[in-house]
Structures are given as structure tokens and as C-alpha cells.
Amino acid sequence: MSSLPVSESEGEGSGTSVQVPSRGGQVTPGEKAFSLRTKHVFLTYPRCPISPEEAGQKIADRLKNKKCNYIYISREFHADGEPHLHAFVQLEANFRTTSPKYFDLDEFHPNIQAARQPASTLKYCMKHPESSWEFGKFLKPKVNRSPTQSASRDKTMKQIMANATSRDEYLSMVRKSFPFEWAVRLQQFQYSANALFPDPPQTYSAPYASRDMSDHPVIGEWLQQELYTWSPGVRRRSLYICGPTRTGKTSWARSLGTHHYWQHSVNFLEEWNCQAQFNIIDDIPFKFVPCWKGLVGSQYDLTVNPKYGKKKRIPNGIPCIILVNEDEDWLQSMSTQQVDWFHGNAVVYHLLPGETFIPSE
């Protein structure tokens, strides 16, 4: 079963729960004393054969002087066949106890939490019940912000997004209109500012002139057939260059036109430039290149799953220039089938001894 959300409160009356001490109720060194103060309680009784009706009546009897609004108890079975109970309790006012055994049913001790999202907690309890018991009527907690207030805040935020002309101006307007949110959620506003006002793609400036490779028998042919001209509707082949360091490979490749450049790791979190003519994969071991067939094979659309971001679909259809040194030769890390596929989708070239992309003086 999915884990229960216990983050922000949906309304009034949220409380805090401290981890329960060990079964004997004794507080061991380094362990916090148990304390619960809340209007909404969520209980889980593992490996408990008591019926929901019996459990509910016992809990209701225990809370008879506490102005209890609502109780819901459900029974579920784990994959091993053992039953467990979920209980949700709603009271009129904040309930407080420092006894970790307050909700014990006979010898069965529950996990106790303050239900900070009452409606979500109740929905969780009702997800897959084998049987259930209910008492009273659940009262949805009041939302702290009225619809009018929410509409006003949304309107203000839309105006900020429409009128801001830069990241700094956007953040300044947010700070002025929403000072508390700006203080506690600055990182989120910075993220949205970067999304609204991304950095323009940087134009690469080569540190020195590179050798003209248009007459090279292998590289020149690739430039002409796969980069400068190509047949529409036909996936283009990539270029793989393996050779020593300090031969000018990177500077030459980056001077060919607008491109995506990845060194040491492929980062799909960066802004995707739809004007890029090719991708450059520089000094990245084969095993660390995600979607390598999609990139090398110039597939038109790629579905990527960045490590710290959401899965997304990006347009591609452009070839790669892959640059490696001999100690990271991709072909040495591939299976026979992968090598065959690679040769079918990329022009492979190993620099000859003394060959360089740096023009002679």
C-alpha cells in the first residue's frame, strides 16, 4: 500500500506527534517522551485480529468524554495474510495525551500519528477495506484561506508573471506581494524565475582557430552528408572520434555551430535549445550515457528521466559528435551486438598517430 501523506495541514486543528517509546512505555536514554495534541488521530494496529466494530466501540468508549465527532476503522490483510487495522478519529477540540498506551486495545499497541491531512488520511483508510466500522459524521476541516482570498492571490500572481521582465524584477514583485511565502519558499520562486526567464543559449568562442576538416576523407564526408546537408526523413548518423588528449577535438567540434554540450555527464535538466544543430558528448564513459541509442541514432523524440527531475519528452533528430580518449573507447565497453548497431548509426574514426585538429603554424 502507498505511504500516507503527513505533510502540510489541510485546515485547522493540526497537531504534532512525537515518536512513541518502546512497548513497555519507558523512555530510554536519547528517546523523546511521548506527547500527542491534535483534533485528528491516525492509528495503525499491525497483526491485530480484533474486528473493526469491536475496536471502534472500545475507542469510542475511551473517548466518550472527549467530544468525539467521528471514528472510522477498516481492516486489511497483508500479503502474508495477517490482518491490520487502520483507525481515523476526529474530535471537536484538540485532544492531548502523554500516555503511549492510551489507544492500546488489549495487548495490541498502535502506531500513533497526528493526521495533518484529515481528508487524505480518511481516504487512505477507506482505500482497500476488507471490513469497516463507522461512527458519527466526518466534518471537513475549515480551509484557512477563503475562496475570495485564493482568487485574489492567484490574480496577483498572474499579474506578476505577466508584467515582470526579468528574474530580479519577478522575485522583487513576489517579495513585495507575498513576503511570508518569499521567506519560506524562496527556492521554489527562484526555480519558477529561472523557468520564466531562462538564460539565453551561450555562443561558444573557440580559444584558437581549428583546422579545416572539410577535405578529410572520413570527417569531411560526415560533415557534408550528415551535418551540412542530409535527406529529409532519414535519420542522420553521428560521428565518433577517439584519440589522444590535447589534439583540439573539443574546440573543433564546438566551433561547428549551435549545439548542446555535455562533458563528464549528460544533463537533461538544462534548457533544451531547439535551434541546436548537433549534440556533443565529451569525455563521458559509455556506461554513463543515458538514452545512448536515442542520441547516437538521432531519434526524433527522446523520453528522458533526469535524476533530479521529472520524466519529459524532448525533440531531437540531430546527430551527436562523441569525443573520447583511448582509455574510454566506447567500443571496448560494448557487446558484439552493440558494436554492430553503433557502426550502423555512427561514423567511427580513430585519430592516426600525430593527427590533430590544431592547425600548424
Swiss-Prot record:
Its main location: host cell. Residues 1-31 are annotated as: Disordered. GO terms for molecular function: ATP binding; DNA binding; endodeoxyribonuclease activity, producing 5'-phosphomonoesters; helicase activity; metal ion binding; nucleotidyltransferase activity; structural molecule activity. A motif (RCR-2) lies at residues 84-86. Residues 266-285 are annotated as: Transactivation. Residues 35-138 form the CRESS-DNA virus Rep endonuclease domain. Divalent metal cations, possibly Mg(2+) or Mn(2+). A motif (RCR-1) lies at residues 42-45. A motif (Nuclear localization signal) lies at residues 307-317. It is found in: Host nucleus. Keywords: ATP-binding, Covalent protein-DNA linkage, DNA replication, DNA-binding, Endonuclease, Helicase, Host nucleus, Hydrolase, Metal-binding, Multifunctional enzyme, Nuclease, Nucleotide-binding, Nucleotidyltransferase, Repressor, Transferase. Gene3D superfamilies: 3.40.1310.20. Its cofactor is Mg(2+); Mn(2+). Homooligomer. Rep binds to repeated DNA motifs (iterons). Forms the O-complex, which is a Rep-DNA complex involved in the initiation of RCR. Part of the C- and V-complexes which are RepA-Rep-DNA complexes involved in the c-sense and v-sense transcription. There are 3 rolling circle replication (RCR) motifs. RCR-2 is probably involved in metal coordination. RCR-3 is required for phosphodiester bond cleavage for initiation of RCR. This is Replication-associated protein. The lineage of its organism: Viruses, Monodnaviria, Shotokuvirae, Cressdnaviricota, Repensiviricetes.
